[in-house]
Amino acid sequence: MTQTVPYRCGRIAVIGRPNVGKSTLTNALVGTKISIVSNRPQTTRHRLLGIATFPEGQIVLVDTPGLHREQKHPMNRLMNRTARGSLEDVDAALLVTESTHWNEEDTLAYNLLNDTGIPVVLVINKIDRFKDKSALLPFLTHINENHTFTTIHPVSALKRKGLETLVSDLLALLPEGDPMFSEDEITDRSQRFLASELVREQVMRQLGEELPYATTVEIEYFTENTGLFRIGALIWVERESQKAIVIGKGGARLKEIGVKARQQMERLFQTKVFLETWVRVRKDWSNNEAALKTFGYE
């Protein structure tokens, strides 16, 4: 008689310092892009659920902003609160770090997770950078000697390497139970939210070095017609000089942001998109916690 394998379902927080590939890992496990990515700090600013459904179970990933040691800036304080708050009501956590690089912010994340008592899986990301994987051995030895993890997984989220065994170990940590979401759901966030994030992703990719804190995106309208989404995206900055940078010479930069964001939306929403973008100034909004909350920062 064949024994039925019990279905498992639960929530797993994805924690780590900025720019180690947490959102790339979330996207890879879900199987499609729901979290924006760039090589700039503060790309992820909100908590977002990624729903990864498999025949054996459902993993609800809680993608979080990167943990910062620097908390003088209100944005950093809010993002740290969001990351810490994501540890409530989770069954386990993924601590994501970068291959061979462990710093004080990794230790901050490790200590935070260690205090919770939940199972912690270490994901060593970006191993595709090493042709000779034996170069990882000294780092793995150091980690094992100085830290305690339920399991350790070297992976490449970008290349989707090492994910099968990671998924198997994560499912084993979850309680038996019915799925929380239907099989076709991939996130708890609305299409309106995802549209704003895809515009912000292009701003970060093209202007993140010049405007690290100063931009956010608000959706002014989002209408759905048969075969077409009409979306109006307002990009907020803090100075007139920043507005000029976002618009670019003859509007070229803003046009490029719009084109790239629209292409990403059409890929995600599986429909044609008409996207209108424009830029406005709200002085010092990122230094004002009340203003941050009006823009949806929790």
From Swiss-Prot:
Protein name, entry field: GTPase Era
MF annotations from Gene Ontology: GTP binding; GTPase activity; ribosomal small subunit binding; small ribosomal subunit rRNA binding
Superkingdom per UniProt: Bacteria
Topology with respect to the bilayer: Peripheral membrane protein
List of residues binding GTP: 16-23, 63-67, 125-128
Region span, G2: 42-46
PROSITE patterns (UniProt xref): G_ERA, KH_TYPE_2
Pfam family, one: MMR_HSR1
Heme found in the keyword field: no
Record region (G5): 155-157
Location(s) in or outside the cell: Cytoplasm; Cell inner membrane
G1 as annotated region, ranges: 16-23
Stretch list, region G4: 125-128
Family named by the database record: Belongs to the TRAFAC class TrmE-Era-EngA-EngB-Septin-like GTPase superfamily. Era GTPase family.
Primary location: cytoplasm
Region (G3): 63-66
Protein's UniProt keywords contain GTP-binding: yes
UniProtKB keywords: Cell inner membrane, Cell membrane, Cytoplasm, GTP-binding, Membrane, Nucleotide-binding, Ribosome biogenesis, RNA-binding, rRNA-binding
One GO cellular component term: cytosol
Name of encoding gene: era
Chain ranges of the Era-type G domain: 8-176
Domain spans labelled KH type-2: 199-283
GO process terms (BP): ribosomal small subunit assembly
Function per UniProt: An essential GTPase that binds both GDP and GTP, with rapid nucleotide exchange. Plays a role in 16S rRNA processing and 30S ribosomal subunit biogenesis and possibly also in cell cycle regulation and energy metabolism.
Subunit text: Monomer.
